[in-house]
């Protein structure tokens, strides 16, 4: 557990431990962490800044909290890693210290995209690999299907390839080549189904469970959806504050809107998962609060219990 906003993160860690019985180890400077509520601490004297270069920071700051957390997983002193710090450095630490699962070409970030049905769409890659190869994206699909089943209970994950049209012949050369490879996979043996191309409008709909794309496109799509959601919520709040009548209407609608808000609230999902490394790694948003951190730790614990790493190893290597 890496420390950034120590108050929210420590509170979330303590809650995950106290309410769910999850053993948590904090990593950082003890004097800055504060009251841990009895949780153990792995001391780390350095902190990788949010704007630091990921690769060079991980290589040179060997006593940073991110590196120490990844080493704890590598050395079996922890089962998983959760961080709300520098995303690139988190990925680099997990990759360089714990290593890739045998047979996995590149790890990918799997991010839940909430939708109206209550079961999110898993989008990957959401930013780990700006440039991809078609065979990497086939592995993303395999890992995403395993994650969707383990995390959200999707019995037969429907895998879609994000493109500019549903027809098989549409898309960039990378998308077209990936489509051919995905169509050749025996998805039934993995308990999944390839449904072909999907479009951006399908990401929040009920038609697809796993949406596969390269990290550049996936990150742009994710940030676009986040921006749209933030602006829509802001516009609604502004509209409700217009008159006394709209304020009264808002109070009446609150019980119905609250469950909808929670369904689309990123904090309820805890964060994204880096799939493909030997140790489970949850990447939370830098602004994560107590709820998000507690949920992220719960997700990490669940992924360990369900042996998602082992399932991916079996799927990739047969």
Task: Label every PLM stretch briefly.
Residues 46-47, 86-89, 96, 166-167, ...:
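Short glycine-rich anion-binding loops that position phosphate/pyrophosphate groups of nucleotides
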Residues 23-33, 130-200, 209-210:
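Glycine-rich phosphate/diphosphate-binding loop of Rossmann-like nucleotide-binding domains
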Residues 12-22:
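A short, Lys/Arg-enriched amphipathic alpha-helix followed by its capping loop at the start of a domain
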Residues 8, 95-119, 123, 207-211, ...:
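Glycine-rich phosphate/nucleotide-binding loop
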Residues 37-78:
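Phosphate/nucleotide-donor binding subsite
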Residues 1-5:
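Conserved small/polar residues in nucleotide/adenosyl-binding loops
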Residues 17-19, 58, 62, 72-76, ...:
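Solvent-exposed alpha-helices and their adjacent loops that cap or buttress functional pockets
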């Amino acid at each position: 557990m890496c420390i950034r906003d120590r108050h929210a993160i420590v509170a979330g860690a303590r809650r995950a431990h106290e309410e769910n019985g999850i053993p948590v180890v904090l990593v950082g400077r003890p004097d800055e962490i504060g009251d841990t509520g009895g949780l153990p601490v792995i001391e780390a004297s350095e902190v990788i800044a949010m704007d630091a270069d990921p690769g060079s920071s991980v290589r040179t700051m060997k006593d940073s909290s991110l590196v120490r957390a990844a080493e704890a997983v590598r050395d079996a002193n922890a089962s998983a890693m959760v961080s709300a710090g520098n995303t690139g450095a988190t990925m680099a630490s997990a990759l360089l210290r714990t290593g890739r699962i045998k047979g996995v070409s590149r790890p990918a970030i799997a991010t839940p995209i909430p939708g109206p049905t209550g079961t999110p769409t898993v989008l990957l890659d959401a930013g780990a690999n700006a440039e991809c190869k078609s065979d990497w994206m086939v592995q993303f699909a395999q890992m995403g299907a395993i994650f969707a089943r383990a995390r959200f209970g999707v019995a037969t994950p429907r895998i879609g390839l994000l493109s500019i049209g549903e027809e098989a012949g549409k898309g960039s050369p990378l998308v077209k080549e990936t489509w051919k490879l995905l169509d050749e996979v025996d998805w039934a043996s993995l308990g999944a189904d390839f449904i072909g191309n999907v479009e951006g409008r399908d990401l929040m709909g009920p038609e697809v469970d796993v949406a596969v794309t390269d990290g550049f496109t996936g990150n742009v799509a994710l940030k676009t959806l986040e921006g749209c959601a933030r602006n829509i919520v802001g516009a609604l709040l502004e509209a409700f504050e217009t008159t006394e009548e709209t304020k009264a209407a808002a109070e009446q609608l609150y019980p119905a809107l609250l469950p909808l808000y929670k369904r689309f609230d990123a904090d309820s999902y805890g964060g994204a998962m880096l799939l493909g490394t030997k140790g489970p790694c949850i990447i939370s948003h830098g602004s994560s609060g107590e709820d998000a951190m507690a949920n992220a730790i719960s997700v990490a614990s669940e992924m360990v219990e369900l042996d998602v790493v082992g399932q991916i190893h079996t799927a990739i290597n047969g």
